[in-house]
Every structure is written in C-alpha cells, then in structure tokens.
Amino acid sequence: MPNALKRFNAEWREGEMTNDGRADEKLDLLSPIAQPFAMSTPQLEINASRQFVSWLREQRLSLAFTTYQTGKLFLLGCKPDGKLSVFERTFERCMGLAVSGTQTLWMSSLYQLWRFENALPAGAAAPGGYDTLYVPQLGITTGDVDAHDIALDSDGKPVFVATLFSCLAAPSETHSFRPLWRPPWVSRLAAEDRCHLNGLAMRDGKPAFVTAVSTTDVHEGWREHRRDGGVVCDVQSNEIVARGLSMPHSPRWHNGQLYVLNSGAGEFGRVDLAAGKFEPLAFCPGYARGLSMVGDFAVIGLSTCRENRTFSGLPLDDALAAKNVAPRCGLLVVDLRTGDVVHSLTIEGIVRELYDVAILPGVAMPSALGFKSDEIRRTITLEE
C-alpha cells in the first residue's frame, strides 16, 4: 500500500459520520436491525429486516443509494462481525447511479456528473474494515439540466438523461452536453422538461429503453398526464412498447427481460414486448424509484409521497388506502421468481425520498470521500 494512503488510514476515524458530511460527530450504527442514530433534528432511523445483512453477504455485494432531497449518497455493506455498515457523504441533489465492477461508480448530481474510483489496492482495507474507498476522481460540469438516470455504454462511457431538455446525452469536453437522442414526439431540444424523460435501460452496451411521464411536446406538459400518460419507448426503433403507466421510472434490462417501475401506481413489473403490455410483479408500498438487479432478485427504492401536487392524486394513493398502509421510504428486495418481498430496509426521519439504487458487486463494506471534510486532502495515492 502506498505510504500516502497509509498515512491517511492512520487518521481515519472509524464509524464517524454527520449530517453535513464532516467527521466530527459519531453516528452509532448499526445492528442487523439497525438502532436509531443521532443527527441534527429531525433524526434519521434505519431499520433492516432480520435477514437483510445475511442476504448482502450471501450475494457478495453492497448497495449504494441516493437521497436527492437531502443530498446524500449512502453506502450499505456488511461489517466483519455481521452487523450492517452504513456510510454517507454529501453531494447536492445526487440522482442516478451507474457501476462498473468494483472500482468505478458514476453519479449524476445538481450540475455535475461524478466518477468515483476505488483508491484501495486489492486486498487492502481502511481502519474499520472498509474494503472500498470511492474517491470523486472526475467531475464533469453539465449545468443544471436536471440529470436523472446515468448508465455506461460498451466503452464504459456515461450516457445520461437530460430531463430538462427531454433527451439522452453524453458529456462534452467543450459544452454542457452532447445530445444523443430525443423521443419522436419531442419536436426540438428546449429547456422545457416537455415529457419528463427520466429513466434509461441499456442493452448490449447501448441505450435501449427510456421512460417518460407523457408524450407531450410543450413546456411541462407531463404534469397533466401523471395518472396514466406514462410510456416506455424503444430508443432504437422509436416505438412505444408500453402505455398507460403512471409516472414510470427506472427501466432495466435483465436476463433477457425489460423491467420497470410503474411508480405512480406502486407497481414493479416487466414489459411484455410482444404484447406491448406492462405486467405487475409486486406491489410497492411507496413511490417506487431506483431499481437494480442481481440474479433472481430486484432491489427497489421507495419514497414517501411528497406533499405537493406532483405526487398527489395518483393511483398509488388509492392502492395504499385499500391496503390500509402508509407510504414507506427505504429499500425492497423482491424475488423475481415469485414477486415476494424477501428483505427490506426502512428509513424514517429526515430522508423521505430516494432516487436510485445500485448494486456494488464483490464489495463487502464500502466507504467514500466527499468535500465537507479534509479527508480528501489527505488521501494521496500514486499510480504504479
């Protein structure tokens, strides 16, 4: 391990996180059923179901999720003693996530795309057992284009949804972004969020499917079609492959099938491409947004319904009332074979909205650097 990294490790203070990202208040996490930990009011409480941590260990993975309302990137893993590890850092309006192996993590945020790289050599660990240290190595300034989902193409280059401009985009070395594709119903690029294009699924390293809240071509026209105007569109053919959805998000291509969240109805399901039909697999007791797949499992992000017009009057309201449950914030693990929720994690307090969820394969206990403390000044590694 490089000497500079050794020096940093000696100064790392185990288990210390704060609401603003500084390492000066201890947040005492966590047991397999996590205990509440103190933060500035209102507090944050994370509770995992009994086998959640065991599932992480069995699948040999960790999880990352973004909470754009509070501007937090959370990393969940397993401590050596079998307890849940929770790590967080602050990035304003953090949104979409994309992963490449165990080394690279991409994230969209308020006006930048961030590429994180793991600074720990293979087999090394920071004090406390962290086996991965994601360092924000590259920041790409896009301006506030309301970037949502981000994904990586076959060359490992990012493709993202520029929601404000209703298009798919790539980074530019000289401009805010380079437009790649826009839906056939959008007549021109304009900073008008015409259809609330938000989700992106890749297939064979290419953009394959997107979700939009409507097929409108006027300034914020989607707001009038939140209940049933949502669509899934094939990027290659420009054909709509599913209609009648309520604020769909997070399309994902997995094992030869297209999965999507029908967020406004609280449904997770797949799209029958031959029939052009959405088929629900599981009910989500919250506004579902953020989806990542591994093997026979889906990890889904849940948000409580915001107290504004955008999230009011949706089919989800009726479904929750019919089932006599309140909306939840957290994560669900769904078995794709049965549609059953097999594990869960609930979040209460200051965090009420999640945007994206990513699986970190081969990572046991992840950590990251942010910009609110001087840790990033002391983390120096040399390329060999």
What are these regions (language model features)?
Residues 5-384:
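Sequence-structural signature of mature extracellular/luminal beta-sheet repeat domains
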